[in-house]
Amino acid sequence: MERQLDAYCEHLRSERQVSPHTLSAYRRDLDKVLGWCIKQNIGSWQALDIQRLRSLIARLHAQGQSSRSLARLLSAVRGLYHYLNRECLCDHDPATGLAPPKGERRLPKTLDTDRALQLLEGAVEDDFLARRDQAILELFYSSGLRLSELTGLNLDQLDLADGMVQVLGKGSKTRLLPVGKKAREALEQWLPLRALTNPSDDAVFVSQQGRRLGPRAIQVRVKLAGERELGQNLHPHMLRHSFASHLLESSQDLRAVQELLGHSDIKTTQIYTHLDFQHLAAVYDSAHPRAKRMKGDDS
C-alpha cells in the first residue's frame, strides 16, 4: 500500500506538477488513511470500503478535525483512487458519496485598512533584510499572492515597467496580476540588494546566502513584521485575505476579485462578501442615529 501511495505522490509531483505545499498536505492526509488501514488490518487499497472510511472520518471528527480538513482528506482519497483505478490497481472508490460532517465555516481573518497601512508605512531601514521583507509584505498585499506563489516567484515573472507579475497558481494555472505603485517601489529598492548575494537561481526573494527563501522562512519574517508593527500574529494568507476584502469593499466586483485570486469556483470568493457585510454592519452600528437604540432594545 505504501509503495502505491509513493507512486501516486510521484505522479502528483512530476505529472500533475502540484505545488510542494499541496503535495505535502495530501501526503499527510493519505498517511492518516494508511495508518488507519494498518491498525484495522486492511492489507490493500482494494480492501478499504466505504464503511471503514466513514468510521475513520467519524473518529477524526470526534478528535477535533474541522470539516474543511476532512473535506480535504476525502478529496485526497478520491484523487488516490482515481489514480489506482486508472492504473488498474483497484476497481472502486470508497469515498464516493461520502461527505464530511457539516461545520460552521469560519470567516478568514483580515487586517482593516488602517492596520494594513500601519504595517506597510512604518519606517524601513536601508538594509538587506528590511528591504526584502518590505517588498514581500507589499507584494502580498498589493497582488494577493498565495504563499506558494510568492515562494516560487522568479525574476522573469516580474515586469516592473508595466507593473505586472505572472504567477503560477494551483493546478499549474498562470495568471497575470497588477503590482501597485508602492509594491513596485519596494521591489525596485530590493532587487539591487538581491543581486549583491550572487544568487544561485532566479528566485526573486533570497536569503543573505543567495538561496531561494522557502515557505517557512517567509512565514517567520511576516510573523516578525506583525509583532513589530502591529503587536499581533500575522501570516501571509491574512495579507491575501485583506487584499481580497479591501478590493471587494471598494469595487463590489466579485468576478474581478475571483480572477485576481485565481479561484476556480466563485463560491470560494463569496466568503469575502460576508466580510464586507460585517464591515457595513459595523459602520451602520456606529453611524446610524437609530442603531444604538435598536441594539439596546430588548423588547
Swiss-Prot record:
Pfam families: Phage_int_SAM_1, Phage_integrase. One of its GO terms (molecular function) is DNA binding. PROSITE patterns: CB (PS51900), TYR_RECOMBINASE (PS51898). The active site is at residues 146, 170, 237, 240, 263, 272. Gene3D superfamilies: 1.10.150.130, Intergrase catalytic core. Keywords: Cell cycle, Cell division, Chromosome partition, Cytoplasm, DNA integration, DNA recombination, DNA-binding. One of its GO terms (biological process) is DNA transposition. Residues 1-85 form the Core-binding (CB) domain. CDD domains: INT_XerDC_C (cd00798). Residues 106-285 form the Tyr recombinase domain. Coiled coil: none annotated. It is found in: Cytoplasm. Belongs to the 'phage' integrase family. XerC subfamily. Site-specific tyrosine recombinase, which acts by catalyzing the cutting and rejoining of the recombining DNA molecules. The XerC-XerD complex is essential to convert dimers of the bacterial chromosome into monomers to permit their segregation at cell division. It also contributes to the segregational stability of plasmids. Forms a cyclic heterotetrameric complex composed of two molecules of XerC and two molecules of XerD. This is Tyrosine recombinase XerC. It comes from Pseudomonas fluorescens (strain Pf0-1). The lineage of its organism: Bacteria, Pseudomonadati, Pseudomonadota, Gammaproteobacteria, Pseudomonadales.
